[in-house]
A protein has these predicted regions:
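Membrane-active amphipathic alpha-helices enriched in small hydrophobic residues
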Residues: 145-161, 169-180
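Short pre-active-site segment immediately N-terminal to the catalytic Zn-binding motif
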Residues: 102-119, 183-188
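Active-site recognition of the HExxH zinc-binding catalytic motif
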Residues: 103, 119-127, 131, 193
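Acidic/histidine metal-binding catalytic segments
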Residues: 79, 137-146, 166-170, 205-215
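Hydrophobic or amphipathic, alpha-helical segments that drive membrane association/targeting
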Residues: 1-2, 6-94, 179, 223, ...
Length: 489
């Protein structure tokens, strides 16, 4: 459960184990930035395990692109941020301790333009930079650090929908809704997040009116019948006419910019629209409902993605080629052309398309991931391993990237490294016992090099430092008879 995970994440520590600074802000006295980061990572591992995170590299890259623009104008450089998308039709967004910011697909689809999306992200970023979680805890002072950590583990209001197959994920929802209401950011914190966020939007080049604009959209969502379910965003971020008016007034201090969405805003929306259908045929039918010649480039892109998912590669390729010819700057168009060429077994053309794109956009995460997947299908595992490893060494990886590089290493015949990457994948998704078990399997390989042995054993020792007594016992129970003391604990 979430509670058990956080007990582990806080390293078996009670309040006595956490060193409180002699001086500093009241928030630091209750929850240091390192505590926040540790708690946030533990919650993120739980979310990853729930299977609710959208694993589309193009969508993930886009949300981080918008978030990073905002962060650059509000962060002092001491706080890292990670933005991610949750597959959930409910309209919601949330900030976790440690700078992890989640946005539901339902909220992304509810925004009418990029400025509205930027407004939501700016508001959540401000909650993190202003330390609102720690400050809310300081205001109560009644709970120990340990209880607070457990409470914070449940901050995810609606991380996954209530009808999820994953029982654990369902527990996250139940705990999350209760906890976000329990912490219940004060009205002053909400106004402060609006103020800081609007400033960051203006400085980052977004139209600051986008925040109030989205608040107005949300306020119209409020059902008159109280028995109807409010959107999650309204329950966790109450919107009043006064708050909308204040946001509008603050935005007037910045020059009004005509709203012009980036191409990537439309591309992310089109991909999520395709994914929102239960069947590939449903998505195709939606995008074919308008005459092709009447569609704009984003609608045509969505149509091509729907064709691609339905296996109509020739139809998809024709559209991707047309779009790429018109705009060479859009990475998603290069990916679409390359993928459909490979699917049509035009292998030389597909590889050439990806190579050209990689030279234009070096170390672009979605581009390298899609190229790596294409190379694996062609049986070029060594090359896939090489480009994925270069990306991982230069850009902080997602769990999906690590899982893909494990596939590449395995296909290339490097079993030891494949097991190492699988271990890292399990660690990133919160499974410490599984992480060690893959390293132990690697240590048992007869062809293991000495430098790998030293590296893997050091990694095991490092992981064990973060394991609870129960996890150590679980690890011991899972060991084969005769396992070494290092391996069995």
């Amino acid at each position: 459960s979430m509670m058990a995970t956080l007990l582990v994440a806080t390293s078996g520590a009670g309040a006595d184990d956490i060193k409180l600074p002699d001086m500093g802000s009241p928030a630091d006295a209750v929850l240091s930035k390192s505590d926040e980061a540790r708690i946030g990572r533990a919650i993120m591992a739980q979310i990853q395990q729930s299977g609710s995170v959208v694993e589309d590299p193009i969508v993930t890259e886009y949300i981080n692109e918008v978030g990073s623009r905002i962060v650059a104008h509000v962060n002092d450089g001491t706080q890292s941020f990670e933005f991610f998308v949750i597959d959930d039709p409910n309209i919601n967004a949330f900030a976790l301790p440690g700078g992890f910011i989640g946005v539901h697909t339902g909220l992304l689809e509810a925004t009418r333009n990029e400025d509205e999306l930027a407004g939501v992200l700016a508001h959540e970023v401000a909650h993190v930079t202003q330390r609102h979680i720690a400050r809310a805890i300081h205001a109560s002072q009644r709970q120990s650090i340990m209880n607070t950590a457990i409470m914070l583990g449940a901050i995810l209001a609606g991380v996954v929908s209530g009808d999820s197959d994953v029982a654990q994920a369902g527990m996250v929802v139940a705990q999350g809704t209760a906890a976000q209401q329990q912490i219940n950011f004060t009205r002053s914190n909400e106004y402060e997040a609006d103020r800081i966020g609007i400033g960051a939007m203006g400085d980052a080049g977004f139209d600051p009116h986008g925040m109030a604009s989205f608040f107005e959209v949300m306020s119209r969502q409020s059902p008159a019948d109280l028995d109807m379910r409010l959107p999650e965003f309204l329950r966790t971020h109450p919107v009043t006419t006064q708050r909308i008016a204040e946001a509008r007034n603050r935005a007037r201090a910045y020059p009004r910019r005509p709203s012009k969405d980036s191409v990537n805003y439309g591309i992310a929306g089109a991909r999520m629209k395709v994914d929102s259908y239960d069947t590939e045929e449903g998505a195709v039918e939606y995008f074919e409902s308008r005459d092709y010649e009447q569609q704009n480039d984003i609608e045509k892109y969505g149509r091509a993605v729907a064709y691609q998912r339905a296996g109509r590669y020739r139809d998809a390729n024709r559209i991707f080629e047309e779009l790429l010819e018109r705009n060479q700057k859009v990475i998603a168009y290069h990916i679409g052309v390359g993928e459909t060429q490979l699917a049509l077994e035009q292998n030389d053309l597909g590889v050439a398309t990806f190579e050209r794109a990689v030279s234009l956009f070096p170390r672009n995460v979605p581009l390298v991931i899609h190229y790596g997947e294409g190379l694996l299908k062609l049986g070029e595992a060594d090359k896939a391993h090489r480009i994925l490893l270069d990306l991982m060494n230069n850009v902080p990886p997602t769990p999906e990237q690590v899982r893909l590089i494990a596939r590449a290493a395995n296909q290339a015949g490097d079993t030891a490294e494949a097991l190492y990457y699988l271990s890292e994948y399990h660690l990133m998704t919160g499974n410490l016992v599984g992480g060690i078990s893959f390293l132990q399997r690697a240590l048992a390989l007869p062809e293991l090099q000495e430098i790998q042995r030293i590296r893997f054993e050091a990694r095991i020792d490092f992981i064990r430092e973060y394991m609870s007594e129960e996890q150590l016992k679980q690890l011991q129970r899972s060991q084969p008879v005769g396992a070494s003391a290092r391996n069995s604990g």
